[in-house]
């Protein structure tokens, strides 16, 4: 099946799928178009290879005369040897432009995007921070000037081109200004999770060769001070909240930092800004792979600016001149989802970002939502689950009449919205009654009465939670993407969504199901200008994620239904994604527990879609030589371990069920030791259980090569796993296992 592609002059190129597709040039930028193979399913918004709607005019941002022209932003770049990917910090890549619709938007840098925003929305509120009982607001003009001042400060401190500025703290105006200022100054903006240990912070700072690290407070500062002497590239530390506990060389308050660059002329900064190209890296997002080694996802200016434009168009964000969009920033900004929504989408469309309090996820988020009343809200599944739990608890205390009314209204709401989802638009009279009596009041109580766009992503969400909110006339739309796709790849929309589907591909991008099975399921592959440049200093890992044709392999298994909606049906990778959205590779934790506790034979980490991690454990026992079945008798090594800790056990049955307190205490001690070395609280094992029988090939838990068959184990021990999560709350750090 040959693809038909038109170049900018209108010439049609008939592409032989067995041959390489020629590069085209638009605005002096080398671009590449994706190949299409007949034996693989390529699903797009239409049957044509081009994803654009020919009846729609491309949305091309107006570039003012004060902006650097697009072609000059990419001139002087060597193009003959340029590839779609790189692992080098100072390299550029081919941009994946196409010659129609959103994919043809002129590439722009972060500075060009911001300057155009200032020209359009300069006097509109950009950022709002609560100080006491008052909201302190900053306009886009002020925001832009603060970023320039910060950039000069970074230059004064010696920030080198293509070196990192690490940012370690809760969401704030200073976080945003440091991020954008680092990019203006020619460095990389690098978010670091506040839950990271000192060692994890060291890895990120060392990997990006950070010259400067910006921390929120004394708690985060201490992490950096612990590893400062192991960071040869580090030149300065800046603390943006609270007073310094002590004076140290090259340690600055935010106020001091913002005064440092006063003698840096505008021309010096402008020269650095004008040298930046859309196809060069500006941001690093650190994620974890299956080995547990964090990878620095290199995002270019174009990755970010184009994704903001394309995603915004897809979800129909309004420009501030029509009606300003308002968001609440509370999710970790080291995560691509928060960055894209809170920083870049709002910047593109002139939206206002209000910062929540640091204890947002401990309860104050509800207060902030009621105060701010956002027009768009992104919540990871755990946030929606917490809302659901809270509302159910409140409802249980209501009067009988109110409970009956709520039950009736929810039934009406779910029925009406499910019909709407399937194409029915008329709303029955009972829906309007339910809306007035229940739905509007619920939305107001949640602070979502102005919110027309409620999203969830970063982790899977349950059907129960989606239907709960749908019954209250609050459709929660799923997003799907990854750090390597600059955030969203598919999005659900009010007129195009299905329960448990993550929607359809955003404008200008493509999805391919690789090697689909008889059910249509296969690995999900991405194509578009949102696809990342590569992993910093990790060429092999880059080639694992990006194939020779440039398709991004997600590691997820999925399929499309007959209407083009994408469903995730499984995971190729073994990464666990908790309900809080944190990616956790299970093998390192499992191996660490087995190393700490020699009596452990097999360990399987549980936590996908869950609030916390738990673990299934088996003990080392003898195996029947004839059948291969595990027996009850412990191995000599296991018995020796028992003797060392004061246990007299010789059988597995002597221990399981809490019968042997010495063994249980030793295992808990080992788990605690592993938890102490974890990089965040989300990576700590909170509950565990010893199974009565070891895993085996004959039992079905292990494959022919003794590889753990996780889905099989999860199904076999579903009841035990469910028992871990029956309580609503999250257990304490040193949870005592059940007896």
Swiss-Prot record:
One annotated GO molecular function: long-chain fatty acid-CoA ligase activity
A Gene Ontology term for the protein's cellular component: endoplasmic reticulum
Major enzyme class: ligase
SUPFAM superfamilies: Acetyl-CoA synthetase-like
E.C. number(s) listed in UniProt: 6.2.1.3, 6.2.1.15
Catalytic activity: a long-chain fatty acid + ATP + CoA = a long-chain fatty acyl-CoA + AMP + diphosphate; (5Z,8Z,11Z,14Z)-eicosatetraenoate + ATP + CoA = (5Z,8Z,11Z,14Z)-eicosatetraenoyl-CoA + AMP + diphosphate; hexadecanoate + ATP + CoA = hexadecanoyl-CoA + AMP + diphosphate; (9Z)-octadecenoate + ATP + CoA = (9Z)-octadecenoyl-CoA + AMP + diphosphate
UniProt cross-references to PROSITE patterns, sorted A to Z: AMP_BINDING (PS00455)
Similarity annotation: Belongs to the ATP-dependent AMP-binding enzyme family. Bubblegum subfamily.
Record's protein name: Long-chain-fatty-acid--CoA ligase ACSBG2
């Amino acid at each position: 099946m040959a693809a038909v592609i038109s170049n900018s002059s209108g010439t049609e190129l008939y592409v032989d799928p067995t041959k390489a597709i020629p590069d085209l040039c638009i605005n002096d930028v080398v671009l590449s178009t994706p190949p299409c193979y007949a034996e693989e399913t390529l699903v797009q918004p239409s049957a044509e290879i081009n994803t654009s709607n020919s009846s729609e005019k491309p949305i091309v941002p107006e570039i003012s005369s004060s902006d650097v022209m697009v072609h000059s932003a990419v001139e002087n770049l060597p193009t003959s040897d340029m590839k779609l990917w790189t692992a080098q910090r100072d390299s550029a890549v081919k941009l994946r432009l196409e010659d129609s619709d959103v994919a043809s938007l002129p590439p722009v840098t972060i500075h060009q995007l911001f300057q155009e925003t200032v020209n359009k929305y300069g006097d509109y509120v950009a950022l709002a921070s609560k100080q006491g009982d008052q909201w302190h607001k900053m306009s886009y003009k002020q925001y832009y000037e603060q970023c320039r001042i910060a950039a000069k400060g970074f230059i004064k401190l010696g920030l080198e081109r293509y070196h990192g500025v690490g940012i370690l703290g809760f969401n704030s105006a200073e976080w945003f200004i440091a991020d954008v200022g680092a990019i203006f100054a020619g460095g990389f903006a690098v978010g670091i999770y506040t839950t990271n240990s000192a060692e994890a912070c060291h890895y990120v700072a060392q990997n990006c060769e950070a010259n400067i690290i910006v921390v929120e407070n004394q708690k985060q500062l201490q992490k950096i001070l612990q590893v400062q002497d192991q960071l040869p590239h580090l030149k300065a530390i800046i603390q943006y909240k609270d007073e310094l506990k002590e004076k140290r060389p090259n340690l600055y308050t935010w106020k001091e930092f913002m005064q440092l660059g006063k003698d840096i002329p505008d021309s010096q900064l402008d020269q650095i800004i004008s040298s930046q190209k859309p196809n060069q890296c500006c941001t690093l997002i650190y994620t974890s792979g299956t080995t547990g080694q964090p990878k620095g996802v290199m995002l270019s200016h174009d990755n970010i600016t184009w994704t903001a434009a394309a995603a915004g168009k897809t979800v129909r964000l309004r420009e501030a001149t029509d009606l300003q969009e308002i968001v609440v920033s509370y999710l970790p900004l080291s995560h691509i989802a928060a960055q894209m929504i809170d920083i870049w989408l709002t910047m593109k469309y002139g939206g206002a970002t209000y910062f929540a309090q640091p204890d947002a996820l401990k309860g104050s988020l509800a207060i902030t939502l009621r105060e701010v009343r956002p027009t768009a809200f992104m919540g990871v599944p755990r946030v929606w689950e917490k809302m659901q739990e809270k509302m159910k608890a409140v409802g249980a205390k209501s009067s009988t009449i109110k409970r009956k009314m709520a039950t009736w209204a929810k039934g009406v709401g779910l029925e009406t919205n499910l019909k709407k989802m399937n194409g029915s638009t008329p709303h029955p009279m009972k829906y309007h009654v339910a809306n007035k009596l229940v739905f509007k009041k619920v939305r107001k109580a949640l602070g979502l009465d102005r919110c027309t766009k409620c999203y969830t992503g970063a982790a899977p969400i349950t059907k129960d939670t989606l239907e709960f909110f749908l019954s209250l006339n609050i459709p929660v739309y799923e997003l799907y993407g990854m750090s390597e796709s600059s955030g969203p790849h598919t999005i659900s929309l009010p007129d195009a969504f299905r329960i448990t589907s993550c929607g359809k591909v955003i404008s200008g991008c493509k999805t391919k199901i690789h090697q689909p099975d008889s059910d249509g399921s296969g690995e999900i592959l991405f194509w578009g200008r949102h696809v990342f440049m590569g992993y910093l200093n990790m060429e092999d890992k880059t080639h694992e994620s990006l194939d020779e044709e440039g398709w991004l392999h997600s590691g997820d298994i999925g399929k499309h239904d007959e209407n083009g909606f994408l469903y995730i049906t499984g995971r190729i990778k073994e990464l666990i994604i908790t309900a809080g959205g944190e990616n956790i590779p299970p093998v390192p934790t499992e191996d660490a527990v087995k190393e700490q506790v020699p009596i452990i034979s097999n360990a399987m980490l549980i936590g996908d879609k869950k609030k916390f991690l738990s673990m299934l454990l088996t003990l080392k026992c003898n195996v029947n030589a004839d059948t291969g079945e595990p027996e009850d008798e412990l191995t000599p090594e296991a018995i020796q371990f028992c003797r060392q800790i004061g246990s007299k056990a010789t059988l597995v049955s002597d221990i399981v069920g809490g019968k042997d307190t010495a063994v249980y205490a030793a295992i808990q001690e080992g788990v605690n030791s592993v938890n102490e070395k974890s990089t965040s609280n989300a990576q700590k094992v909170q509950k565990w259980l010893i199974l009565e029988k070891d895993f085996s090939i004959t039992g079905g838990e292990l494959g022919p090569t003794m590889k753990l068959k996780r889905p099989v184990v999860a199904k076999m021990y579903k009841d035990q796993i469910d028992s871990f999560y029956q309580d609503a709350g999250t257990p304490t750090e040193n949870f005592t296992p059940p007896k």
